Amino acid sequence: MIQFKNISKHYQLKGQTIHALDQINLDIPAGSIFGIIGYSGAGKSTLIRLINLLERPTHGQIIINQKDFTALNAQSLRQERANIGMIFQHFNLLQTKTVAANIEMPLKLLGYSKIEREKRLMELLDFIDLTHKKDAFPDELSGGQKQRVGIARALANHPKILLCDEATSALDPQTTKSVLALLKKINKEQGITIVMVTHEMDVIESICDHVAVMESGHVIETGPTVEIFSNPQHPTTKTFIQTVLQQHLPVNILSKLEHQHHHSIYRLQFLGKSAQEPVIQSMIKQFDISLNILFANMTEIDGTVIGQMFVQLLGDDTLIQQAIEFLERHGVSVNQSGEQV
């Protein structure tokens, strides 16, 4: 487990104190894919760089597997850093070195023999599916291939933790998808804890099982990704989720409804089992009401299906209330439009 305990990071800039991080307390479970999301300047990149002490906190402790990294001497810290790999937005490959030389570099620095380096190199090239690019130079690679080389280099010494700082933000959507699939494979097959900094909520949706939302140097919300998506509390979190999971009726639909007879609009949210059962069909059969579907969407997060639907319920008020209670008994969250959701 990675633990941030009362972490603060302050900078001096033109005579002023900048509070990059302020009183951060956060636990990252071992073996998880943990996303850290926030807008530019939120402090997320500073936070991830504290894990391997590329940045040192002004106050607080970084505890990894029950070791306080902030209390380690230089030699002990070097040894512990060997268990932490890192990949970057712009790949950070040596342009004058081949793919093989880039991947082997950390192994050379750590004193691996030539035979050991060659063996590990071929394992990694096979794993990232770039054996045919062994002797190529970075300029001959696509963005996705460069990032795969960066990932292989980060994995060279069998790390227990992999830090990803905006690792997909320079890639096109299809390449992003393939890189995320590779990271998920690494986590599943090797049990490596992955910490991902991103400003893209679809990255969190695609791969992360836990997430922390940051704003102005604070963690404003954190928890399992499914819980955060299904029940966001902070306005900033809701804004992020809105980019991948519609939380409000689209404006064009609302404008059409303005000219229709008023009917209450409800937001129905289905989670897990309720998203896969014919709950709506059962409700319509049981109650003498009509249902007008205005908008619906569905996604899968960490193996759990989340669906939501904006509907008008038409009919007798008593029957509508009974229908709502029926839905809630069957695991559907019901909120009338305009209520806090």
From Swiss-Prot:
Group of enzyme by EC: translocase
Keywords: Amino-acid transport, ATP-binding, Cell inner membrane, Cell membrane, Membrane, Nucleotide-binding, Translocase, Transport
Pfam entry (one): NIL
Protein EC: 7.4.2.11
GO cellular component labels: plasma membrane
Domain of life where this protein originates: Bacteria
Self-association state and partner proteins as the record states: The complex is composed of two ATP-binding proteins (MetN), two transmembrane proteins (MetI) and a solute-binding protein (MetQ).
Family: Belongs to the ABC transporter superfamily. Methionine importer (TC 3.A.1.24) family.
Protein function: Part of the ABC transporter complex MetNIQ involved in methionine import. Responsible for energy coupling to the transport system.
Keyword Acetylation carried by entry: no
Keyword Nucleotide-binding: yes
Catalytic activity annotation: L-methionine(out) + ATP + H2O = L-methionine(in) + ADP + phosphate + H(+); D-methionine(out) + ATP + H2O = D-methionine(in) + ADP + phosphate + H(+)
InterPro entries associated with the record: AAA+_ATPase, ABC_transporter-like_ATP-bd, ABC_transporter-like_CS, ACT-like_dom_sf, MetN_ABC, MetN_ABC_transporter-like, NIL_domain, P-loop_NTPase
Membrane-protein topology: Peripheral membrane protein
Organism, as annotated: Acinetobacter baylyi (strain ATCC 33305 / BD413 / ADP1)
Localization terms from the record: Cell inner membrane
Matching SMART domains: AAA, NIL
GO molecular function: ABC-type D-methionine transporter activity; ATP binding; ATP hydrolysis activity
Protein name as annotated: Methionine import ATP-binding protein MetN 2
Residues that, per the record, bind ATP: 38-45
Residue ranges of domain ABC transporter in the record: 2-241
